[in-house]
Amino acid sequence: MARRNGNNNFLNIMRSMLSFLDTRIESSDIDASNTPGGVFMNRLRSRLVDLISGRIGDGDDGREDDETRAPPPGRDLRGRGRKVRGSARQEVPSVEERNLVDRCNRMMNETEERPTRERRRTRAVSRGSERNGETERPRSEGVEDPVTLTTSIVVTGDGLGNTQAPSQSAEAQDETGPRSSRTVGSRGFRVVFPRIPSQELRFLFLTPQSEGSRGNIIYEIQINFDVFEASSEAPTTATKESLKKSSIVRAVEADKGCECAICMSNFIKNQRLRVLPCDHRFHVGCVDKWLLGHSNKCPVCRTAI
């Protein structure tokens, strides 16, 4: 019973999150296919649908197996029915899925609380204006909605990416400004989050879109939430002193099959690579720019240096 309830609770939360996103998309005047916020919500919604469908499919497979199994001699149908209901495969949510439930709940709860906070703030401003004999515009006007306006995602249509040279992407970004499009690697797609006009956080989906396993879906959803939640966090960048915790090595023959997760280009023999304490390695120029200008965490595993 506990296993079945655990699975049902997880599915209920995911369905609630799906309904929440549908409501936001329908009630918003943004273009869900072209605007940054619309793309973000649509992408998150599609992965939730995949996750829910996968869970239901697993349960159905288990029920079909039990229902097609012949009852043992001497066992009446009533007893068999109880056995079928009790033995249908129902999975306990994994640690990653429980974390996903918490994040979905937080997003929905914060959205429900926000109108109340805004109404209280508006009433307070209104009362202050009446006392001062002034008319002030409510502070909530013009405030960007963090769900619909703060995140943009660049997704390739077929998961293959474009063919522009990856090494050009970092320099091109500095020249053309933070809102210009980014080079998309051949293994997945890149998330661009413009927190402030002069800065942005870049997160990479490192698994191909063609792989539909539940682990990949959960990973992609978690990255979407990482991008969203970063909007309320002040950036913590590394210092030149903290970079000393890492080491610089030369790429060897064995590294030629690996790639830098930032620029998505393969390592070349004798290139200088920075190896972080978590053992992930990147081109020195790529990762130094990330650590000193954007975040003090590894772009892959989010471990602080």
From Swiss-Prot:
InterPro entries: E3_ubiquitin-ligase_domain, Znf_RING, Znf_RING/FYVE/PHD
Residue intervals passing through the bilayer: none
Pfam families xrefs: zf-RING_2
Residue ranges of the region described as Disordered: 53-185
Single GO BP term: ubiquitin-dependent protein catabolic process
Keywords, comma-separated and alphabetical: Metal-binding, Zinc, Zinc-finger
CDD domains cross-referenced by the UniProt entry: RING-H2_RNF103
Biased composition (Polar residues): 161-171
GO molecular function: ubiquitin protein ligase activity; zinc ion binding
Zinc finger region(s), RING-type: 260-302
Name of this protein: Uncharacterized RING finger protein ECU07_0330
Organism: Encephalitozoon cuniculi (strain GB-M1) (Microsporidian parasite)
